[in-house]
A protein has these predicted regions:
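Juxtamembrane/disordered regions of integral membrane proteins
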Residues: 2, 7-170
Length: 170
């Protein structure tokens, strides 16, 4: 007699993979973004943007912001890992699609909302007494350069590809 194998309706998440590969993917994204900045392709600086939420000193802000960015990358990697587990597979192209959705939300929702919560970012509602020193990103982060949306798309799709290649649901 043939016995049917029990099927699992829930895939287990790759916790060790998430912990390691989330850091790998975020470090790759940050390195690529920094390289694009140094090449003059964009003026966006995620570590500075995030770090100035905590401190006004730009040097300290970049250090603090780097670690905040790593933490945010881990949070997003958790979402990617959960998605791969739900789909029972992880591939480079699913990772790329998730990266495209990720950057789409970041450029059209998250970054445009930043002036409303960032204490050191200029906004149209801040008034004349504002001491804000950071330029708001604007829609698609175009205030940081015309190539910024393309740079952001490339590095976030790369982030998804890295996770899609390295993570495997169990």
């Amino acid at each position: 007699r043939h016995r049917a194998r029990p099927s699992s309706t829930t895939a287990e998440m790759d916790w060790a993979g998430w912990a390691l590969f989330g850091l790998v993917a975020t470090t790759a994204l940050t390195a690529a973004l920094t390289a694009a900045q140094l090449a003059g392709l964009t003026r966006i600086d995620f570590p500075l943007l995030l770090g100035t939420l905590v401190t006004e000193d730009p040097d300290r802000a970049r250090v603090v912001g780097f670690f905040l960015h790593l933490g945010a990358g881990q949070g997003f990697a958790l979402g990617y890992t959960a998605t791969f587990a739900l789909l029972h597979r992880a591939t480079w192209w699913i990772g790329a699609l998730l990266g495209a959705v990720h950057v789409g939300i970041a450029l059209t929702v998250l970054l445009p909302l930043l002036p409303g919560v960032h204490p050191r970012m200029a906004s149209q509602r801040a008034g004349p007494a504002s001491t804000a020193v950071l330029e708001p990103p604007g829609l698609f982060a175009l205030n940081y350069g015309n190539q910024t949306p393309a740079v952001a798309a490339v590095v976030h799709i790369m982030y998804g590809v890295v996770l899609g290649l390295l993570l495997q649901p169990h």
